[in-house]
From Swiss-Prot:
Pfam families: TNF. It comes from the Eukaryota. Keywords: Cell membrane, Cleavage on pair of basic residues, Collagen, Cytokine, Developmental protein, Differentiation, Disulfide bond, Glycoprotein, Membrane, Secreted, Signal-anchor, Transmembrane, Transmembrane helix. It is linked to Defects in Eda are the cause of the tabby phenotype in mice (the equivalent of anhidrotic ectodermal dysplasia in humans). The disease is characterized by sparse hair (atrichosis or hypotrichosis), abnormal or missing teeth and the inability to sweat due to the absence of sweat glands. It comes from Mus musculus (Mouse). GO terms for biological process: canonical Wnt signaling pathway; cell differentiation; cell-matrix adhesion; cytokine-mediated signaling pathway; gene expression; hair follicle development; hair follicle placode formation; immune response. This is Ectodysplasin-A. Its main location: membrane. Belongs to the tumor necrosis factor family. The chain crosses the membrane at residues 42-62. One of its GO terms (molecular function) is death receptor agonist activity. Glycans are attached at residues 313, 372.
Length: 391
């Protein structure tokens, strides 16, 4: 917005409507008419419109003046007091005179002013200027002192620049206004709304699977404090079973009187046709089908066995083994005597350290013999002597 826009604004039509309104309402002694009330309302409407136009003109003028002040300050900072732009802009006293455009248009009658009606007396120019200045001071009392000071400053500038040529102001006017310096940054705005949720990310690389190897055991902790002694329990009855357990446990098995051919009647050569004569069930357990004797308690055991054999098919000797978990522990071998009968017995015994769940059995070595399972000549047993010695 520049200075030429001020010259193109229309003059303020304030005095003419006032005089017409006063004549229409008969305030100057005219005879009353029938439509006097309507004329008063019409006058008030025109008066309000005129007042609104006044206010609009004043607002535009104040905006123009502030723009010119900013432009002048920028040019003075950039080029100093003798810059061409400053002298050209301020060479005309009416460019920054806050009252100049208004009083010039109001003081000189223009062709846009409405003609006076017959019987109206025009107000003198001085009274019109004073009337407009009074309105300006009434609505903007703070601008009065600044307007007078600005007018005096423009006049001094005009006198100091009067020696310049006539082409200088015209050239400066054609340049136009320059851009002012950037203002300070404004306060940050409010945060915006949250954006939409983004797509899911790429799954990460799976980690290295851990190992199930147990680490080395840590050092033993310090011993805890000794607890208080417990309460004395009630006196118990004498345990008779303890004395029985301290006694030697015995098992004795006998044949049932049958005759057995090893090749046809025995599976794997193990004798299984036993009858129990005596057995401690807490220490021994017999498996009838397999013929094995299981030990239930660790300890030192005396194992014994005897078998009556009958030689057949020109066999001149017989042999059997006492096995522990199918491993040979004792072995007995007997040959036939010349001129004797084919029956003969073979006895063997020994001491062995056994652990719980170990099994004892009698196994024949040769298959071409027959066994006489008589209860007096064929038997098998074991005696627990005591606990195993400490290693």
């Amino acid at each position: 917005m520049g200075y030429p826009e001020v010259e193109r604004r229309e003059p303020l039509p304030a005095a003419a409507p006032r005089e017409r309104g006063s004549q229409g309402c008969g305030c100057r002694g005219a005879p009353a008419r029938a439509g006097e009330g309507n004329s008063c309302r019409l006058f008030l409407g025109f008066f309000g419109l005129s007042l609104a136009l006044h206010l609009l003109t004043l607002c535009c003028y104040l905006e123009l003046r502030s723009e010119l002040r900013r432009e002048r300050g920028t040019e003075s900072r950039l080029g100093g007091p003798g810059a061409p732009g400053t002298s050209g802009t301020l060479s005309s006293p009416g460019s920054l005179d806050p009252v100049g455009p208004i009083t010039r248009h109001l003081g000189q009658p223009s062709f846009q002013q409405q003609p006076l009606e017959p019987g109206e007396d025009p107000l003198p120019p001085d009274s019109q200027d004073r009337h407009q200045m009074a309105l300006l001071n009434f609505f903007f009392p703070d601008e009065k002192a600044y307007s007078e000071e600005e007018s005096r400053r423009v006049r001094r500038n005009k006198r100091s620049k009067s020696g310049e040529g006539a082409d200088g102001p015209v050239k400066n006017k054609k340049k136009g206004k320059k851009a002012g310096p950037p203002g300070p940054n404004g306060p940050p705005g409010p945060p915006g709304p949250p954006g939409p949720q983004g797509p899911p990310g790429i799954p990460g690389i799976p980690g290295i699977p851990g190992t199930t190897v147990m680490g080395p055991p840590g050092p033993p902790g310090p011993p805890g404090p000794q607890g208080p002694p417990g309460l004395q329990g009630p006196s118990g009855a004498a345990d008779k079973t303890g004395t029985r357990e301290n006694q030697p446990a015995v098992v004795h098995l006998q044949g049932q009187g049958s005759a057995i051919q090893v090749k046809n009647d025995l599976s794997g050569g193990v004798l299984n046709d036993w009858s129990r004569i005596t057995m401690n069930p807490k220490v021994f357990k017999l498996h009838p089908r397999s013929g094995e004797l299981e030990v239930l308690v660790d300890g030192t055991y005396f194992i014994y066995s005897q078998v009556e054999v009958y030689y057949i098919n020109f066999t001149d000797f017989a042999s059997y083994e006492v096995v522990v978990d199918e491993k040979p522990f004792l072995q007995c071998t007997r040959s036939i005597e010349t001129g004797k009968t084919n029956y003969n017995t073979c006895y063997t015994a020994g001491v062995c350290l056994l652990k719980a769940r170990q099994k004892i059995a009698v196994k024949m070595v040769h298959a071409d013999i027959s066994i006489n399972m008589s209860k007096h000549t064929t038997f098998f047993g074991a005696i627990r002597l005591g606990e195993a010695p400490a290693s």
